[in-house]
Amino acid sequence: MVAEMIGVVDDDASILRAVQRLLGSLGFTVKTFGSGEDLLASDCLERIHCLVLDVHLGGLSGFELQERLSEAPVQIPIIFITAHDDPPTRDRARRAGAVEYLRKPFDEHALIGAIEKALGRR
């Protein structure tokens, strides 16, 4: 069986490394991207089962990227993450259809639970 692919978009390399290590240790295939533009230019969008997406990115914001992805034929479940948490941002993430919204630094169990929820495992 092919491992489910999780995409992670964040402009913080330490977050990308930590999430890749964690999810890789659980058997997921993990693709990391330093920007929304990098994700859009990649050839693996159709293979991503879930996207962990930073709200505040250089270039396209997480919300702008989510808007573009919402026009695609296949919808990817999104988990928004952010270090700049506030009620309007949380509300916007929920309105955008986020599976989950996590504040950095987030607990690894919270991320795993959110991914399981996004993949329909719970």
PLM feature segments, named:
Residues A3-A13, V19, L23:
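Conserved acidic segment of CheY-like receiver
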Residues L16, G58:
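The feature encodes the CheY-like receiver
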Residues T32-C50:
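Acidic, metal-coordinating helix/loop segments flanking the phosphotransfer/catalytic sites
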Residues G34-S35, S61-E64:
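Acidic catalytic/metal-coordinating carboxylates
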Residues D54, T82:
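Active-site residues of response regulator receiver
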Residues F63-V74:
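Short amphipathic alpha-helix used as the core "switch/output" element in two-component signaling
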Residues P88, F106-E116:
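C-terminal output helix
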